[in-house]
Every structure is written in C-alpha cells, then in structure tokens.
Amino acid sequence: MAAAAGAPPPGPPQPPPPPPPEESSDSEPEAEPGSPQKLIRKVSTSGQIRQKTIIKEGMLTKQNNSFQRSKRRYFKLRGRTLYYAKTAKSIIFDEVDLTDASVAESSTKNVNNSFTVITPCRKLILCADNRKEMEDWIAALKTVQNREHFEPTQYSMDHFSGMHNWYACSHARPTYCNVCREALSGVTSHGLSCEVCKFKAHKRCAVRATNNCKWTTLASIGKDIIEDADGIAMPHQWLEGNLPVSAKCTVCDKTCGSVLRLQDWRCLWCKAMVHTSCKESLLTKCPLGLCKVSVIPPTALNSIDSDGFWKASCPPSCTSPLLVFVNSKSGDNQGVKFLRRFKQLLNPAQVFDLMNGGPHLGLRLFQKFDTFRILVCGGDGSVGWVLSEIDSLNLHKQCQLGVLPLGTGNDLARVLGWGSACDDDTQLPQILEKLERASTKMLDRWSVMAYEAKLPRQASSSTVTEDFSEDSEVQQILFYEDSVAAHLSKILTSDQHSVVISSAKVLCETVKDFVARVGKAYEKTTESSEESEVMAKKCSVLKEKLDSLLKTLDDESQASSSLPNPPPTIAEEAEDGDGSGSICGSTGDRLVASACPARPQIFRPREQLMLRANSLKKAIRQIIEHTEKAVDEQNAQTQEQEGFVLGLSESEEKMDHRVCPPLSHSESFGVPKGRSQRKVSKSPCEKLISKGSLSLGSSASLPPQPGSRDGLPALNTKILYPNVRAGMSGSLPGGSVISRLLINADPFNSEPETLEYYTEKCVMNNYFGIGLDAKISLDFNNKRDEHPEKCRSRTKNMMWYGVLGTKELLHRTYKNLEQKVLLECDGRPIPLPSLQGIAVLNIPSYAGGTNFWGGTKEDDTFAAPSFDDKILEVVAVFGSMQMAVSRVIRLQHHRIAQCRTVKISILGDEGVPVQVDGEAWVQPPGYIRIVHKNRAQTLTRDRAFESTLKSWEDKQKCELPRPPSCSLHPEMLSEEEATQMDQFGQAAGVLIHSIREIAQSHRDMEQELAHAVNASSKSMDRVYGKPRTTEGLNCSFVLEMVNNFRALRSETELLLSGKMALQLDPPQKEQLGSALAEMDRQLRRLADTPWLCQSAEPGDEESVMLDLAKRSRSGKFRLVTKFKKEKNNKNKEAHSSLGAPVHLWGTEEVAAWLEHLSLCEYKDIFTRHDIRGSELLHLERRDLKDLGVTKVGHMKRILCGIKELSRSAPAVEA
C-alpha cells in the first residue's frame, strides 16, 4: 500500500516514443556556404511509388558518416525522385528530390565504386558492387536530370551526350569554379572536376554547369564548325582559367594564367594556352596537338547506323587512328586514372572502359577504317578479350594491337617491348608517340579444343613390371604377336621375292604355333563349352585371314615374275646397326609419305595386301584380348591371380596409352630417322616396354586416303628426350614399320576422328598450363573472387602467388601427373618423366616475366623461340622450386619439344586444373588439342628505330640552316658583288691548285679530299667557265660554289689537324696554310652580302642550337655559370680574331690568345719556348709546370682554353 500511495496518480496514457529514424535519413548535409543546413525527411509508401514508372532499381551500399555505418539499401528511381528502403518489399521508403541534383564519382581512383548524389540540401554517398553498375546508376541519374528517356543500353553511349562527368577531387594550388568564378572551398580547393575537360565547379554549382564538355561528334561542335575549300574543319575549343603555373602564351610567348582569378584560355585539343587579348591572333583552325595522328576529329563522327551505333567516316587526315580500351579494374584501379587521361588527350568517343560494355562498341565504331590501331590498357586477360571480339568481327587485317601493361603478369606486354608495368599516367603523351613509331609483328593464336570422355587410368609402372615378370606364359603369347608384326613388316616393305616368300613361310608356322598354344592356355583357364566355341570361331577367322594374305602374296608374285627388273623400293627406312632405331626424329627428319600414291604398277594389289595384313593383325589381337578376358574372369576369385591379371590387362593398355596415342589418319607408313644411340638406364616404364611390344590391332594403321589432308607427312618435331625415345623404338621387334604403327593404335578407340566434335574452350595467346601451375592459378582466382580487396595491387598478387606456390611445395598435389595425362606433339607420343605439370608456351615470357624455355637463341637441338613462327614450346614443370629458380636462372633441362600441334589426354575419373593465359578451370577427363587458329597484328616497340630517329633529330638541330632559295635574293649579282666574287674565285683557285700540287706527293690527301675538290671545281667552272653575259653571274650558281668551298676548307683543316700535319714539308704546310687563311678572309667578307651571310658563317641562333644539341646528347642537365659562358665567348672571339686555324698559329697568335685569357704574364715564357699552335693543342699539366705555370687556377684556365680550342673551333668553322 505504501508503494502504491507513493506512486503518482495514473493519468492519461502517454504516447509511445517515436521510433528512431533509419540510418539512411541522417545523410551528411552539404557543408558549403550558402546551402541550407536543415534536412527535412520525406517518406512515401510503396503504393504511391507503384503508380510511377520505374527507371532503375537495385541494391546499393549507402554511407552515412563513415564506412563503419554503411548499410545495404534497396533503391528505386522513378520520375525525378530517388526512393530507398531496407528491402524491396518495405512499405515505407525515404525519398530524395532530384530536381536540382548532380551526380559525381567520389574519388580519384574510386576503389569502392562509390558516387555522390548532390542536392541543394544533402549529399548522398552510394557504393555499387562494380564499376559497371556504378556507371549505370550515374547514367540513369543524368538522364533524369536532363529530362531524357533512359534505356539500359544507353550507358555505353554516355560520352556522346556532351554532359560533364564529375568526380570529387582536391587541388594543390588555388582553383576557381568555372560556373561562379569563385575559389573552391578549403585549403585543398576541394570540389568537382570533369574527368574529360577539367571543368571545375563547386558541388552546389555543378547542377548549373552548361553541357559544353569536350566535343565528340560533328553535331556537338554546332555552329562553330569551319567550312573552307578543303571541307569542314574543327576550331579551337577553349576552356577558361586554371592554367598550370608554367603556362606561356602561344602567341606572344609570355606567361599567362593566374592564381588570383579565373583568366586566360586553354584549348582542350591542341593544349594551346593564350591570353584573352591574344586569342583572336591565333589561327582559328585547331591542329589537334601532338597526338593528332591518333586522334579521331569530331568531324569524322557524323552519322548513326540502323543498329544505333555511331559510324566513323575516314577523313584524309585520319589514316590510322587509335582505339583505346582500358580495364578500369586493372592495377589497383589505376585504370580509372588512365581512362580519364586518355579522354583528355584524345576524342572521348575513342576511349572505352572494358568493364562497361566490353570491346564490341569500340570495334563497331572503327570497323569502317581501312587501318587503325588498338591500345589495350590492362593485363593479358584484357588483351585476350579484345582479340576474341576482333575474331567475331573479322577485323584482323585492319587493326594492329598494342598493350599498355596495367595487370599483374603482363607477359605479352613484356614480349612486345612495352615493359612490365606502367603506373604513371603523366607519361601517356610519350607513350602515344612511341606507339606511332612502333613496328608490326604477327602473333600466333592457338585454339584450345576439348572433348570430354572418360579414359581408364594407368597403374604404377613398378607394379606392372613386377606382374609381367612373374608370368612367362603371357610373355610367350606376346612374343607371337611381335613375330607376326615383324614378318608382316618384311612382307610389306621388302621388294625381294625371296625375302617375301621366306617371311610368309615363317608367318604361317608362327600363326599355327600361336593357335595351338592359345588353345592349350584356353583349356587351362576355361571350362565353358560356349566360350570354347567362341575361341574356335576366332581361330578359324584367323586362319581365313592368313589364307587371304597368302593368296594376295601369290597374285603379286605372279605379277612381278613377268618383269625382268626388280621394282624400286617403296620407302626409305633408317637401318640401325643393332636393330633398335629411334622413333624420335632429328631437326631435318620427316615422316616418309604414304607409299600408296607412288606405288609401281607391278604392285597393283598392294592396297589389298595392306588390308589383309591389318586384318590378320586384328585377328591375332582379338584372340589375345579374348584370352586375357577369360583369364581375368577365372582368376578374379583368388587374390594372387587377381594381381597377375591386373598387371597383364591394365598395364598393357595404360602403357600403350601413355607412350602411344592413336595414329588416326595423320601418319602413313614411314618413320623418321633415329637421332641418338645413347644408352641410359631404363625407367620402369621402359623396362615394361622392353618386355612386351605394346602393339594393338586397329584400323587406325590403314593407309590414308589419297588426297586427304591428314595424309601429309608429319611436320618436324624436336624432342629433348632422345634416350627415352630410343629406348622405346629399341624395344620394338625388328624396328619395322608395322611395329611402329601398332604402337600408335588407340586402346580406347574413343577419340573423335575430326575436330568437329571438339569444343573450343578458349584461345591461347601466351601459354597453356596443366597441373601444378594451373592449380596455383586456380587457387589465386578463387581467392580473388572471395576477397577482392586482398588482390587489388600487383605486389599483393605476386605475394599471393608466392604463398600458394609454397603451399604446393609442401602438398605436391600433382606429383604423379604423368600417370594422369598423356602427351602428344605433332602426333608423336612423348613418354613423360615424373613431373607435376606441363606448360605449352607461345611467347618467351611465362607467369610474370619468367623465360621458362630457358633461352632466346637457337642451339643444336632447338630453334630460337618466337611468337610468330607457328611453333609451340613444350616444357615440363617438376615442382614449385623449379618455377621459383627459373626466375633467376635460365634452366633448360626441362624442355620437352617444339611442335605445331599438342594433344593431351586426361585419364581417370577426376578433372585436372588447366589454365590459359592466367585464367584457370578444372578440365574433366578427355582430350585437349591445341591447334593454330590465326595470327594477329601486334605493335612492337622498336627501340632501334627510336634511337636512330632521335639521333637524326639531334643531327637536324645541329645542321646549318638551309640556304635561302633564289626567290629570296636577286637572280643576278650586282657589279659590286661580282667584283667581290672575282676576288673569292682567285682565292678559291689558289686553294685548289695548292691541294692538287701537294696531293701529287701525298696519296692520303688525294683520297681524303678528292670528292670535295671535284665538287668545288665543277661549281667553279659553272660560274667562271662560260663567257660572262651582260646580266652578270647567276646567284644560284654562286651560292652553290660558296657552299662547296666552305666544305672543302673545313675538310682540309680537319685533315691538317691530324697526322697529315706531320707528313707535310714546311714549305707545303706554309703554302696550304696561306691559301686557307686567304679563303677564310674571303668568306668573312661575304658576311656583308645579305643573301650570302647565312651561308658564310653560322649565326647566333645556330650556335644556340649547337649548344642545345650537345646538352641533349650529354644525358645530364648542366648549370653553366655566367663566368664560364663569358670565358667560352672569349675563346671563340680570340680564335675568330686570329683568323688562321689553331694548328697554323705562330708564337704571336699564341701570345694573343693568352692575352684574351687575361694571362699576359705567360706570354714571354711561351714565346721564349717557341710554343706554336700545334704544340699548344698537345700541352698537358706537367708541360705547364715545366714552363713555369705554378698557380693551380692559371693552369686550369689554360687547360680549359686548350680543350675548348680543340673542341669548339672546328665545330664553329665547319
């Protein structure tokens, strides 16, 4: 009661507290000044929303104030309002009015695919699952803002609309809004920037920005288009303000732009920057800048085809435009930066994001061009995607493809010369320039075909060997088959009648003995009368086949007896001394073509003979198989006999299938020569082969049909394991053709005869892997799919590969892969050692830059690897350690073969990991064939051409200016000029006379100066040789003569500065020196003639160009002080004032030179020691000490002056 009394009296019921608002309602308000700070929440019911037409809907992640508070919400865009709630079935939806809204990406790299919806009173930050979904939402919101109809297919055409593509960013210097002209807020000038044209805006001003983004089509240019006699052209597209600090006006070459206000202009295409007052002085037509070769001008996009795709016309100025595909996910989202930079450099309509629609739209746009280039910015997977789309549109003959490495491995980019990685988007102009100078190479592309079929798995070799060794009875049975095969081979290949008859007799006895022994063995193992009857029928069939063969032989014998001469041989076969030839062929070996088309007339029934031989072989094989089956059934009841039967029946099939794939119809009766006779220890597999012939009867050994493409000789295959192959062929009885064909019989008979039944899984451009490397790649792909945030950078990806490789080093998942797969190269079975994987290489770069083949040059066994020779390299993967070591050391012991086709059979019931160019999957049991598909044109960086071109450009800078044309000066000389040229002609004649006189006694001078003297004499004869007309001398002939004599003077002085100065006598040296001095004096007088002054001596501009060229070749930026410049000028002035060449100086000229260096105190010393010009050029530090120059500063000044004289004087006079 007390408690009740103390309680307050009950009043009216209090309303329940309002529910807390959803997280989605407390979005961050716009913080910029002038924006309302109060957020009014509006809600709608699902019924109200249902009445409106939906534009787009889906789940997005909504951020509030931090990532920790981000929530998944369901968004619906209907009309000009955005609705969101927790789920699609929610009743209450929050709404955002989009009347004055703008949308922008949230960051520069935008790793989380976020975008911001900016309204006058709030800012809504949303994150999509991927970039494509984000761009879909941005495009839908833009169309709503623009009051346009949105269709889901329009997202890929967004850059044709002319609207700005905003993203939020900060700036390192004051930046101004292009809408309100005020500075962007904050110390970092945070605001919005258009990713294409760099239009700047406040977030509140973005909605008021005009749609004047960079032009893409002819319609977007509008009324500013220029029409002239050459057609239509594009004017400059100007954007005001926010110029870089180093901006200079293109017209007046003065600094422009400002950090205090929005002023001056920049062209979005040619990047020209001008003052507002100079803008009218610039040419109206835009030259499109340094990248004009790669740019598609907007005037070329002027129509749309029936499918809604833009069509590009082919203007004359656009011969090989560039189509750019960027994978925005590649390289830790570095692709987003490259995507924006390419849109700024080129036409945005020629830049496409592979994550937003793929390559189809871009290729459709460019397919009308006769030739165009493609640049794929991404990894090897992106390149394969683009090439596959090129296949579907059949554009291989029109386009050349280059690669900019943004992925993880980038193997193809390494091989093509574009490097292993590219992270700096500021280098794109230089990259585009290198792409224009690239050369073209063909890239082989290979189809990876698959046919799924369950194939029995082979057992361990050791177990098989033991089982075979325990049973001598089975070995004797198999011996009969070997004997039959050997004698059949002699009958088919021998042209000697006696050999054929003797082989036929032995064959008859062997078959009879074989039937008798089979009968005895069959009585021991079978008691059923039914099975006895079956065996009796098979033996009777065998007897019929033998009779048919003998009858055919008799017919042939009768035909051959009528001719006097023996027939020619059917085929040439390698004869081994011990009868154990090698199946493996050397480099130049080829399989002998089928003997059927070249059969002589006396062997008319030879086709029947082959058929009879094969039938006989089949019959024997059927009897043996039936015997084995009966033994299997009888002995399956006991444990000991079960092991014997398994060792007989299974191992024979497995070892057959391991080393001998089916022949199909691709091989004929012929074998290549053996390559090696080396004897090595036999593996368990080879021991088994040595005990049994592994021959199986099959129709596959029939001769090919005439005219069949598969009947052609096999291509050369180079195999590294000659010892293994020699062991195989040595185990076959007699080394005969039939025995070698029997080894190729298909024990399962399950492979389709043609590729029509195969399915193309993918196309290989780089490499194919099965086993260990594919397992690592598959694990990495699965981890990247589960945790994409852990695999966003190239460094992290390489670390993950290392971790997964170390894991496989311990687990050894595929340590017995040779028991799970069989390998054929060009139709030849390859016995495999113990390995964990097989790699098939098309390019010499594997798994991120490893040269897994182990070399780039040709050797005695293999040709040099190349990606344009239609040859694959096959290598073995022994383990993770080998893959790691091969990155440092070029290993070669794991090479298997070089071939043109590869076939891999997967045995058992379980699939095996397979990877192509880094994309991995688990391939079910069956067959995999790798065959050549086509070739693609690729752009390869040509460093040699770039170096040569750069040298040529430097040389062009150093060359003298071209002589002015006759139109720049009078056609005839005046009287004063004619008098001056007469004096010049006299000096020229003296110089030529002196050179010819000295050349009579010095053959070296004649050889060195003959060309220059002849050219000067001809030009002199042209001027003075004919009678002078009343009009005077022709100025063009005079100009040519002056130039020739300048060249002659330079070459003569250069010759005298070398060893020739020591060979001449003093009178000859003095005679030639005086002639050269007079020529120099006449050339300096020509400087008074305006149209000859440029030819007479280099001007200041040329000197500057020479200096720049020297500086650029040095590779360093050197600061030259004012004192050093003045000193160099003094040296040049001293040299020019003294007139004569340095090596002709006397003591007076040397003293004058010292006076120019302000070292008058040493004049007497140099004169007393008779230091002349030739000695001066060879003075060294110790010589100066001996002369009495003790001060270090004076010594350095003299040595630098001497160096300058010997280096710059000839260059200036040349």
UniProtKB/Swiss-Prot annotation:
A single GO BP annotation from the record?
A: intracellular signal transduction
Q: Localized where? A: Membrane, Clathrin-coated pit; Cytoplasm
Result of mutating F369A? Answer: Decreased interaction with AP2A2
InterPro entries, per this entry?
Answer: ATP-NAD_kinase_N, C1-like_sf, C1_DGKdelta_rpt1, C1_DGKdelta_rpt2, DGK, DGK-delta_SAM, DGKD_4H, Diacylglycerol_kin_accessory
The DAGKc domain extends over 317-451
User: Reaction catalysed?
Assistant: a 1,2-diacyl-sn-glycerol + ATP = a 1,2-diacyl-sn-glycero-3-phosphate + ADP + H(+); 1,2-di-(9Z-octadecenoyl)-sn-glycerol + ATP = 1,2-di-(9Z-octadecenoyl)-sn-glycero-3-phosphate + ADP + H(+); 1-octadecanoyl-2-(5Z,8Z,11Z,14Z-eicosatetraenoyl)-sn-glycerol + ATP = 1-octadecanoyl-2-(5Z,8Z,11Z,14Z-eicosatetraenoyl)-sn-glycero-3-phosphate + ADP + H(+)
Tell me the CDD domains matching this sequence. Answer: C1_DGKdelta_rpt1, C1_DGKdelta_rpt2, PH_DGK_type2, SAM_DGK-delta
Q: Specify the superkingdom.
A: Eukaryota
Assembly with partners or alone: Homooligomer. Monomer. Interacts with AP2A2; regulates clathrin-dependent endocytosis.
Protein name per UniProt? Diacylglycerol kinase delta
Give the organism the record lists: Homo sapiens
